[in-house]
Amino acid sequence: AGLSQFLVKVSNLIVDCAEIQRLDIHPLLASGNEFTALDVTLDIAPFIGDRESRLAIRPYPLHLEEWVEMKNGERALFRPILPEDEPLLRAFISQVTKEDLYYRYFSEINEFTHDDLANMTQIDYDREMAIVAVRRSEEGEEILGVTRAISDPDNVDAEFAVLVRSDLKGLGLGRRLLEKLIGYTRDHGLSRLNGITMPNNRGMVTLARKLGFDVDIQLDEGIVSLSLSLISTDKQE
């Protein structure tokens, strides 16, 4: 445990300080949970550009955390999903009706496996983003809604989806989550946000229209295609 904590602290140092070019700790003496660095070499230089682009794995985007007030006056924390959210996500899904799950996944799903939930919570923040609305209480945390975008290999377009707990509709969560996702994907440099839903999912169709999506109802296919350009008018001109 001691070594793990030491490595985490070194990793945090590298993540936070883009100016570090080289860090050499040698020798390092360990005695139980105590460590003594006898010699440290640190090379630094000015860094210009995306500070996170130099990292093999993009770290947790703490800057995306935001407290949002719902229509009922309660506050929810909007934040990127974490690997440890798996049990919270399982509990959230159990409070979504089969009808709403069918609208989201286009099939009847009886149960999500551990692998399914792991894939939903253990994500590469550079290629995928899932933002959850979390309510905190004395009993702990609970997920109220989630929105997700998965980009293509070129990081140009992204497929999106949004799901809110069935007993919490009407609080503006879906809209606020999707607005948050639109802002993130636009800032991330993506060009277009795409999604599909069903014609009888009127709530999603109405929300998409309000947020400026192009809505293409394809009754023959039984789907509604949703598409939003993320490129500002100034850039297009």
Give the residues covered by each predicted segment.
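Long, contiguous binding/interaction regions
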Residues: A45-E237
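N-terminal loops that bind phosphate or other acidic moieties
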Residues: A1-P46, L230-S232
